[in-house]
Amino acid sequence: VQNALAALAVAGEYGISMEMAAEPLCRFEGFKGRQQIVHLNGVTVIDDSYNASPVSMKAGIEVLGSLPCEGKRIAVLADMKELGPDTVKFHQEVGAFLKEHPADQVVLYGELAKEIGAGLKAAGGDIPLTEVKSLEELEQWLDDHVAFGDCLLFKGSNSMGLSKAVAYMKEK
């Protein structure tokens, strides 16, 4: 948003009308895997699968909570990689954050993602948690549990491959 506002300000300085300057911005669809919101057969998918840090994961959870949603809000969260010696702590902090920004269901994929569940439980959260061990198991869970009106967030480090689960949802 800040970049778009800066572009509009520069256009204004050069005498370009706001309508003319805004027109290309209206066609901008964002960057693949970075908070792209897609509507698929009655299901809203937030594809934030490209990468993850504690700050960006919390932001994704906030976006999930802010969207209008007729069904369940489901956070599909995978490992955050390359965080250094405080990796476990950072995952647990995301879990504690979920208590204050609840989803209806959390699906965890990866060894480190289990620490998100530990952080949620330690904070006293009672959101239903499901742990999956593979992308295939995640796809099966999605088939069995996602319904019309649901909103899903896919968030994790790129190396976890959540973009494949998003592609699976798009193919359904």
Where are these regions (language model features)?
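ATP-dependent carboxylate-amine ligase
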Residues: 6-172
